[in-house]
Regions:
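DPxDG-like acidic metal-binding loop motif
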Residues: 96-125, 138
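N-terminal beta-alpha supersecondary unit
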Residues: 2-81
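Residues within alpha-helical segments
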Residues: 71-72, 109, 130, 138
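ATP-dependent small-molecule kinase catalytic core of the GHMP/sugar-kinase superfamily
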Residues: 2-31, 118-196
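Short pre-catalytic strand/loop immediately N-terminal to key active-site residues, enriched for Gly-Thr
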Residues: 30, 84-96
Length: 199
């Protein structure tokens, strides 16, 4: 097998409770992740040596995005000689809190585990994913989940039964910037609990 195609679903958080900021810069939190039908498409094809990215969105074709970082991390960790050509058909809006970049990274990690015949377990893939981003473990796990820690401690939860109307205003919000601006103490201090979203 030299080529894989995947769907990368978006997610919503039914609630997000930010507990405190850790000394490593991440935040401890509690949340409920739900996968939704909106998805990007990706394809992966083994090639000689290098990692390359093509996309219907030019801003993704660089070495700073989560897909490239994920591929390079796996290639370096496991000393893989092969390269990979990656194509991203982006549908999930960026800056919307829908997890598109994390979903793409998770698909990359899972696909390369198969293409490069690494035979890593889900737990091992999740450990790699959490170094890329806090939401990546959830997308690797691939099930609706309650999450704790930075988002890597996952427990199955039921799917919601109601239909969802998703509205994306023409505003870009950086998740990192929003977390950086929270007024929270670090975990070694007394800390406040702040709920960003509670439905």
């Amino acid at each position: 097998m030299n080529k894989i195609k995947t769907k990368c679903p978006a997610k919503i958080n039914l609630y997000l409770k930010v507990l405190n900021k850790r000394v490593d810069g991440y935040h401890n939190l509690e949340t409920s992740f739900q996968l939704i039908d909106l998805a990007d498409d990706m394809s992966f094809e083994v090639c000689d040596k290098d990692v390359s990215i093509a996309s219907n969105k030019d801003f993704l074709c660089n070495t700073e995005n989560t897909v490239f970082k994920s591929a390079q991390k796996i290639k370096s960790l496991f000393k893989v000689n092969d390269g990979v050509k990656i194509h991203i058909n982006k549908r999930i809006p960026i800056g919307a809190g829908l997890g598109g970049g994390s979903s793409n990274a998770a698909s990359t990690i899972v696909a390369l585990n198969s293409l490069w015949k690494l035979n890593l377990s889900i737990a091992e893939l999740i450990n790699i994913g959490k170094e890329i981003g806090a939401d990546v473990p959830f997308f690797i796990y691939g099930k609706n989940s309650l999450a704790k820690g930075i988002g890597e401690k996952l427990k199955d939860t039921d799917s919601i039964k109601d239909n969802i109307l998703l509205i994306k205003p023409n505003i870009h919000n950086s998740t990192k910037k929003m977390f950086d601006e929270l007024d929270l103490y670090r975990e070694n201090d007394n800390f406040k609990t702040l709920s960003l979203i509670h439905i």
